[in-house]
C-alpha cells in the first residue's frame, strides 16, 4: 500500500461515534427503572405463588431484630410501600394462611417455609440481578444511591405533609 492509498483509506474510515449525553434523572426515568426491576422480581415471585407485598412483609418479619407484632409489621411495610394499613393487614393474613408467618403470642414470626421461600426467591433472582446491575461502575452506583436517598427523603417529607 502506498502513502496515498494509506491516507485515502484512513480518511474514508468512519469517525469514532460520540457517546450520547446521559439522560437526566427524572421521576419518569426512576419509575420506569423501578417497574422494570420489579417486573423481574414479580415474575419470579409468581412462580412461587407469592406477591410483591407478601415478599416485602415476609422480609420485614425475617430481618427484624426482635419479634414483631402485627402493628409493628404494618408500620414497617407501610414505610416501604406507602400502602394502606388495611391492605397490609390483609397481606399479613395471607402470609398466615399460607403458613409463611405464624402467630406466637402477640407476635408474628416467620416459619421455616417462609424463610425457605425468601431464600429460593433470592437464589433465583441473584443471577438476574447480577445481569441487570453488572458492569455499572461503582462510582455511578454511589452517585445513583445518593440521588435516590435524597429523592426518597424529600418524597417521604412531601407525603408526610400531605397526610398530616
What are these regions (language model features)?
Residues 61-62, 111, 145, 152:
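Generic structural concept
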Amino acid at each position: 500500500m502506498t502513502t496515498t492509498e494509506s491516507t485515502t483509506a484512513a480518511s474514508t474510515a468512519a469517525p469514532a461515534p460520540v457517546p450520547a449525553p446521559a439522560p437526566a434523572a427524572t421521576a419518569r426515568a426512576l419509575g420506569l427503572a423501578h417497574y422494570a426491576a420489579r417486573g423481574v422480581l414479580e415474575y419470579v415471585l409468581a412462580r412461587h405463588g407469592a406477591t410483591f407485598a407478601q415478599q416485602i412483609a415476609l422480609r420485614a418479619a425475617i430481618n427484624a431484630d426482635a419479634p414483631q407484632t402485627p402493628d409493628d409489621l404494618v408500620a414497617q411495610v407501610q414505610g416501604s410501600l406507602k400502602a394502606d394499613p388495611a391492605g397490609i393487614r390483609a397481606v399479613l393474613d395471607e402470609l398466615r394462611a399460607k403458613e409463611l408467618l405464624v402467630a406466637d403470642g402477640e407476635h408474628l414470626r416467620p416459619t421455616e417455609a417462609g424463610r425457605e421461600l425468601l431464600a429460593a426467591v433470592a437464589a433465583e433472582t441473584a443471577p438476574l440481578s447480577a445481569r441487570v446491575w453488572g458492569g455499572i461502575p461503582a462510582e455511578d452506583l454511589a452517585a445513583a444511591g445518593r440521588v435516590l436517598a435524597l429523592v426518597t427523603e424529600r418524597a417521604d417529607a412531601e407525603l408526610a405533609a400531605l397526610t398530616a
